[in-house]
């Protein structure tokens, strides 16, 4: 028996043992292995599908985030614009009220000045009238014959009043 050329009996028994092992493996081992490979394949496919769905949801969340950011930005712009409009309106209202109040105060001040002026003019007229009467009375007391004396008397009386 040579190592390189086996005998027919050995070959027969090797083929028979290989056939029995193959038959047992095919009947009991391969279905389990195939089942495990199929389960693993199904698990991998399921995981891939879940990953795709997760990516899809993540994209949806990112799109929602971008939409919310844009919406928030637009609302912020609107609120800022509205606040500026309110600020301008408040400033304009305050200016308008200040102008109205200023005009009212100026009108009242002018009226008061006019009244004071009229009262002062009336007082001056009364004083002039009283002075005129006083001067006339003093002039009449003196002799009316000399004009030069009358003028000196009037000048003297004016100096006394000052």
From Swiss-Prot:
Compartment list: Cell inner membrane
A GO CC term attached to the entry: proton-transporting ATP synthase complex
Gene3D superfamilies: F1F0 ATP synthase subunit B, membrane domain
Pfam families: ATP-synt_B (PF00430)
SUPFAM superfamilies: F1F0 ATP synthase subunit B, membrane domain (SSF81573)
Ranges that cross the membrane: 6-26
Main location: membrane
Source organism superkingdom: Bacteria
One GO MF term attached to the UniProt entry: proton-transporting ATP synthase activity, rotational mechanism
Keywords: ATP synthesis, Cell inner membrane, Cell membrane, CF(0), Hydrogen ion transport, Ion transport, Membrane, Transmembrane, Transmembrane helix, Transport
Membrane topology summary: Single-pass membrane protein
Function statement: F(1)F(0) ATP synthase produces ATP from ADP in the presence of a proton or sodium gradient. F-type ATPases consist of two structural domains, F(1) containing the extramembraneous catalytic core and F(0) containing the membrane proton channel, linked together by a central stalk and a peripheral stalk. During catalysis, ATP synthesis in the catalytic domain of F(1) is coupled via a rotary mechanism of the central stalk subunits to proton translocation. Component of the F(0) channel, it forms part of the peripheral stalk, linking F(1) to F(0).
Subunit structure: F-type ATPases have 2 components, F(1) - the catalytic core - and F(0) - the membrane proton channel. F(1) has five subunits: alpha(3), beta(3), gamma(1), delta(1), epsilon(1). F(0) has three main subunits: a(1), b(2) and c(10-14). The alpha and beta chains form an alternating ring which encloses part of the gamma chain. F(1) is attached to F(0) by a central stalk formed by the gamma and epsilon chains, while a peripheral stalk is formed by the delta and b chains.
Family label: Belongs to the ATPase B chain family.
Designated name of the protein: ATP synthase subunit b
The species this protein was found in: Azobacteroides pseudotrichonymphae genomovar. CFP2
Gene field: atpF
């Amino acid at each position: 028996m040579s190592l390189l050329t086996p005998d027919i009996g050995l070959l027969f028994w090797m083929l028979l043992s290989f056939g029995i092992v193959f038959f047992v493996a095919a009947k009991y081992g391969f279905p389990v292995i195939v089942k495990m490979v199929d389960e693993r394949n199904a698990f991998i496919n399921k995981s891939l599908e879940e990953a795709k769905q997760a990516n899809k949801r993540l994209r949806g969340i990112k799109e929602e985030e971008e939409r919310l950011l844009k919406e928030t930005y637009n609302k912020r712009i609107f609120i800022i614009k509205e606040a500026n409009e309110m600020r301008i309106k408040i400033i304009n209202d305050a200016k308008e009220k200040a102008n109205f109040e200023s005009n009212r105060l100026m009108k009242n001040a002018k009226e008061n000045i006019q009244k004071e002026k009229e009262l002062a003019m009336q007082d001056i007229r009364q004083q002039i009238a009283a002075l005129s009467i006083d001067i006339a009375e003093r002039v009449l007391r003196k002799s009316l014959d000399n004009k030069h004396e009358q003028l000196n008397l009037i000048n003297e009386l004016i100096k006394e009043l000052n």
